[in-house]
């Protein structure tokens, strides 16, 4: 069973609704990618990337993962990130930027912890060195 299915099964009062739905995700994802692209350790991974498309897929992924009505239609995390040289250090940097973006958007600390806890298992599919995420 995939992470999206697990998250949907356990949420009756979805995180998606609690944080403000699609519009809130748009704000968070925009801020998140500003932070990521300003990070010299991460920006190189996005050279030549269609950022508008990526932001749309990121919003779609978060919406589905957080209990929203939108299905995620993108490729599996392992497939998308394979061979990119992403380490657990990079994953943790990205998670830190996500936390900062959620905080800046006014998401409560307990909800941020839920979100970060939900994405932590993705480290195994995203990072090539398979260490444990520190989110």
Task: Please place each PLM-identified region on the residue numbering.
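Core of compact, soluble alpha-helical bundle domains
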Residues: 1-135
